């Protein structure tokens, strides 16, 4: 590998690390794991209960950080602290990849 190619590869890896994108996250595995999320967040990432936020289309790095914080107990929510306690690092990455990959459409309601 020549110097220019090596520098380009190093730059690409650095950009991925800085962006917080989980390299190798599996959207399909995230969808399978999301079955445990559907009662509150829905399989489409759109909230089913007032207490749960809609998470569809949120950035992958944000979702992963929040799941990690709930799992570590640094972010407090009784339900989420319990639900995330059994998640592996791969589960967190996969769930974040799945919910961030959901495309949402914003529609303006007439009269608003």
Per-region residue spans from a language model:
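Flexible coil segments in periplasmic/lumen-exposed cytochrome c-class electron-transfer proteins
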Residues: 25-34, 43-46, 75-78, 82-112
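Cleavable N-terminal signal peptides
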Residues: 11-12, 22-23
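Sequence context surrounding c-type heme c attachment/ligation sites in exported
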Residues: 24-38, 56-65
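N-terminal signal peptide c-region/cleavage motif recognized by signal peptidases
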Residues: 18-20
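Bacterial N-terminal signal peptides that target proteins for export
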Residues: 1-10
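A structural feature that tracks compact, well-ordered secondary-structure segments
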Residues: 51-54, 64-71, 81-85
């Amino acid at each position: 590998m020549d110097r220019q190619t090596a520098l380009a590869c190093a730059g690409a890896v650095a950009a991925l690390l800085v962006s917080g994108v989980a390299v190798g996250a599996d959207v399909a595995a995230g969808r399978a794991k999301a079955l445990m999320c559907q009662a509150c967040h829905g399989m489409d990432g759109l909230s089913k209960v007032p207490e749960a936020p809609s998470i569809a289309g949120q950035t992958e790095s944000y979702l992963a950080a929040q799941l990690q914080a709930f799992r570590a107990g640094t972010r407090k929510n009784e339900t989420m602290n319990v639900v995330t306690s059994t998640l592996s690092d791969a589960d967190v990455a996969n769930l974040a990849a799945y919910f961030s990959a959901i495309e949402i459409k914003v529609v303006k309601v007439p009269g608003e």
